[in-house]
Amino acid sequence: MAQVQYYGTGRRKSSVARVRLVPGDGRIIVNKRDIREYIPTEALIEMVKQPLVLTETLGSYDVLVNVQGGGFAGQAGAIRHGIARALLEVDPEFRTVLKRAGLLTRDARVKERKKYGLKGARRAPQFSKR
């Protein structure tokens, strides 16, 4: 018999994470590597686990993630978003908890483009009166 799987796609900055939740013992596998091997900082790992902690499902699902694009912080945010969306498929009752924590909202903040005539997105060249 086929195993039950729940899917969710998360995005943050330029990262996209495709997340699968499978009943298991709480392992988190990112791009075929353990999360502790893949993500360098403990703070980002805790951020990824946040939806599971809030819904009290931390030890009951294995999380299989395929993530592309961006850096570690963007990828961690995308994984968190994907896990939150997948948990909605597990139980729609989780929506209120996840929504209140802001985990279902796509964080739309991205780097502003550099404009010509300026040194950065907004930083202007030094002004000289004389």
Curated annotation (Swiss-Prot):
Protein species of origin: Geobacillus kaustophilus (strain HTA426)
Q: Name one GO molecular function term.
A: structural constituent of ribosome
Instruction: Please give a single GO biological process term from the UniProt record.
Output: translation
Q: What HAMAP family is this protein classified in?
A: Ribosomal_uS9_B
Hey, which family's this protein in?
Answer: Belongs to the universal ribosomal protein uS9 family.
> Does the keyword DNA repair feature in the UniProt annotation?
no
Highest classification ranks of the organism? Bacteria, Bacillati, Bacillota, Bacilli, Bacillales
A GO cellular component annotation here is: cytosolic small ribosomal subunit
Q: Which residues form a coiled coil?
A: none
Pfam families under this entry?
Ribosomal_S9
Q: What are the protein's UniProt keywords?
A: Ribonucleoprotein, Ribosomal protein
Name the SUPFAM superfamilies on file: Ribosomal protein S5 domain 2-like (SSF54211)
Q: What is this protein called?
A: Small ribosomal subunit protein uS9
Q: Which PROSITE patterns match?
A: RIBOSOMAL_S9
Does Ribonucleoprotein count among this protein's keywords? yes
